[in-house]
């Protein structure tokens, strides 16, 4: 309006808006922050210790490139034992990849609620279909804070070990070789590799000890 030669004050704008029944929808920074905190609540807050299996699951996706192709690896760990309870390898980083991995974990573990599922803010985990899936199972969704990888450091550590101990050490001849190597490493990780957080027990041994103790009680 100023460019067209009109002069108008803030008060005049307010009066015109009142007369027309209009209201401002501007949100201040605190409102936006509070809304984000409610939408992406972090229930873990870097507390990575639990008292039983199926209390908290953590998940993430990484990718590995060979033969000019990206392969995406989605993994879910049980925070109690650090056991890999489900994983899938896909050629596309998609919501379907994370959905099918979660469904595999749920069918295998048949967890007793409450269960918290923690991830970063990747778009697949934020998607409406994925959030509805978790809600349909009664699972509480927890998110890392934006750009804070330490909020999901258990998964960061797992993928670092996977790449350092297996993927970066081998030149795969085919997709089949690569997938077999991932399968083999997961078995090794769960059944043979001691974990410091488990008192140097393997993830499987940590869970078996828990189950045996519960059977005695």
Summary of predicted features, one role per range:
Residues 88-111, 126:
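Active-site beta-loop-alpha junctions of metal-dependent nucleic acid enzymes
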Residues 50-85, 91-92:
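An active-site-proximal beta-strand-loop segment
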Residues 13, 17, 44, 60, ...:
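Mobile genetic element proteins and their domesticated derivatives, centered on retroelements
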Residues 128, 135-139, 161-217:
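C-terminal domain-tail junction helix/linker
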Residues 1-53, 148, 202-212:
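Basic, flexible linker segments flanking DNA-binding modules
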Residues 111-126, 149, 199-204:
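Acidic/histidine-rich, metal-coordinating catalytic segments
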Residues 3-6, 48-50, 66-67, 121, ...:
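Conserved, non-catalytic sequence blocks in retroelement Pol enzymes and Pol-derived host proteins
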């Amino acid at each position: 309006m100023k460019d067209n030669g009109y002069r108008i004050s803030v008060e005049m704008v307010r009066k015109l808006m009142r007369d027309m029944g209009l209201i401002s929808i501007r949100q201040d920074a605190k409102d936006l922050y509070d809304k984000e905190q409610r939408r992406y609540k972090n229930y873990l807050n870097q507390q990575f210790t639990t008292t039983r299996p199926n209390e908290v699951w953590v998940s993430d996706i990484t990718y590995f490139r060979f033969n000019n192709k990206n392969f995406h690896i989605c993994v879910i760990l049980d925070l109690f034992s650090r056991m890999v309870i489900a994983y899938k390898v896909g050629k596309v980083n998609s919501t379907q990849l994370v959905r099918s991995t979660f469904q595999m974990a749920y069918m295998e573990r048949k967890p007793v609620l409450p269960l918290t599922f923690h991830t970063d803010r990747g778009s697949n985990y934020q998607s409406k279909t994925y959030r509805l899936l978790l809600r349909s199972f009664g699972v509480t969704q927890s998110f890392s804070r934006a750009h804070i990888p330490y909020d999901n450091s258990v998964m960061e550590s797992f993928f670092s070990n996977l790449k350092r101990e297996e993927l970066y050490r081998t030149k795969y001849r085919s997709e089949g070789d690569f997938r077999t190597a991932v399968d083999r490493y997961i078995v090794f990780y769960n059944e043979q590799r001691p974990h410091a957080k488990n008192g140097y027990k393997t993830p499987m041994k940590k869970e078996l000890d828990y189950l045996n103790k519960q059977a005695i009680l």
